[in-house]
Amino acid sequence: KGVVAQGQVAVKDKTRCLSIDKSKKVRNFKKMKITITSPTLNGISFKGVGDVHIENGLTTDNLDIESKGVGNVDIQSLTCQKLNVQSMGVGDVKLEGTAQIAALHSKGVGNIEAGNLRANAVEASSQGVGDITCNATESIDASVRGVGSIKYKGSPTIKSLSKKGVGTIKNI
């Protein structure tokens, strides 16, 4: 009850935002679970501590995921046209399902685990420490400029691979 009173739900630029006041300490609970239902979901911006799980599937045209937090984002049974992931935090982003186009960008420590997300076209860039695993059926544009590596499943006929860091790019 006390935790709920500290939470805020607001609408900003047609976006519903859920937050907890940083000045108030949330203590003495083992696990907090927040359930959200929505007719559409086009973006997830995760900047806190904890995990985001979508277990029962998500179908959307476009999905933007921004992860700057200390925790994981896990989406099972995703179906979308265009997926854009920006991982700049410590936690991992794990995706399963299908997408026409998947843009996966890692600048943080966490990994992007999208080996079970079949995408026709994949653009993957690793500029941090984290690794990217993806699955490309038609084309892949992969670039490594850091320590992290890019591993891709599938047999894409169109490949553009660029390595300027310590990391590797490899078909698995």
Model segments located where?
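Short, acidic/turn-prone active-site loops that include or flank metal/cofactor-
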Residues: K1-G2, V166
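Extended, compositionally simple hydrophobic/Ser/Thr-rich segments
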Residues: V26, K33-I36, L41-I172
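Mid-chain, structured segments of secreted extracytoplasmic proteins
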Residues: G2-L41
